[in-house]
């Protein structure tokens, strides 16, 4: 049996401020740092270890992974970073307060932008200061690859391309893997692994910094999945609450 651990980054500064983040590179809040330490302690207490780690090129996911591995005394584990594991790009919504945006455009429209599978938010323009295609971390992207906006379907395509080319072969080689990423990135992976319909993924929420374990067969088909707490596996349908750490 193969085990895969997925973890969404700890609370970010813009999570705290209720702002659309997307590819904006904001850091963890103090609470997010605590959540990451707690996740590492949970994994260590439950006897987990890793051979390889994957994350995005955004600091909130990277720092969460660093902290988790530090808490587990696994700072030596190789870390592979890819923009393909970045959060969904929220286009012109990035940086805006979610409540204020709902007041401006209507709650129904914002809900469609946030939760539908195939509807993109308004796009950035290339002269927008939030357009970061010249950032050196994206220098390997080909012309036209840097998104101006994304729907979940767009995010899923790049995430699954990286899954099939990099992560799946690593798992099949017998390596224990952790992925530290973002809410919509993990939603994309869960949708694929659990073969969820578009309707099924609409209501799927991924909590910050709670380890989500997938037990997979040799073909990487899920046997079962569950969240972890200090007391071990959490009953299906329940999500553990954070403790002060």
Swiss-Prot record:
PROSITE patterns (alphabetical): PG_MUTASE
Alphabetical list of Gene3D superfamilies matching this protein: Phosphoglycerate mutase-like (3.40.50.1240)
Q: Does the keyword Amino-acid biosynthesis apply?
A: no
SMART domains associated with the record: PGAM
Name the UniProt key words of this record, in alphabetical order: Gluconeogenesis, Glycolysis, Isomerase
Give the matching InterPro entries.
His_Pase_superF_clade-1, His_PPase_superfam, PG/BPGM_mutase_AS, Phosphogly_mut1
Q: What is its EC number?
A: 5.4.2.11
Going by the record, the broad EC class of this enzyme is: isomerase
Q: What is the recorded function of this protein according to its Swiss-Prot or TrEMBL entry?
A: Catalyzes the interconversion of 2-phosphoglycerate and 3-phosphoglycerate.
Q: What is this protein called?
A: 2,3-bisphosphoglycerate-dependent phosphoglycerate mutase
**Source species, please?**
Bacillus cereus (strain ATCC 14579 / DSM 31 / CCUG 7414 / JCM 2152 / NBRC 15305 / NCIMB 9373 / NCTC 2599 / NRRL B-3711)
What does the organism's lineage look like at the top? Bacteria, Bacillati, Bacillota, Bacilli, Bacillales
């Amino acid at each position: 049996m193969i085990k895969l651990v997925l973890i969404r980054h700890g609370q970010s500064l813009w999570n705290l401020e209720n702002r659309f983040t997307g590819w904006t590179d904001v850091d963890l809040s103090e609470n997010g740092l605590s959540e990451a330490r707690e996740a590492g302690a949970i994994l260590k207490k439950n006897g987990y270890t890793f051979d390889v780690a994957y994350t995005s090129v955004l600091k909130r996911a990277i720092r969460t992974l660093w902290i988790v591995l530090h808490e587990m005394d696994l700072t030596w584990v190789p870390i592979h970073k890819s923009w393909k594991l970045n959060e969904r790009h929220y286009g012109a919504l990035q940086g805006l307060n979610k409540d204020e945006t709902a007041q401006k455009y209507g709650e129904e429209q914002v809900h469609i932008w946030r939760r539908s599978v195939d509807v993109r938010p308004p796009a950035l323009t290339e002269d927008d200061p939030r357009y970061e295609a010249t950032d050196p971390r994206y220098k390997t992207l080909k012309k036209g690859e840097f998104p101006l906006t994304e729907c979940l379907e767009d995010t899923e395509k790049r995430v699954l391309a990286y899954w099939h080319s990099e992560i799946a072969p690593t798992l099949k080689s017998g390596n224990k893997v952790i992925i530290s990423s973002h809410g919509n990135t993990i939603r994309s992976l869960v949708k694929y692994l659990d073969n969820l319909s578009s309707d099924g993924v609409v209501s799927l929420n991924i909590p910050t910094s709670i380890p989500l374990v997938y037990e997979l067969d040799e073909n990487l088909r899920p046997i079962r999945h569950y969240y972890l707490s200090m007391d071990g596996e959490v009953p299906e349908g329940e999500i553990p609450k954070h403790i002060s750490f």
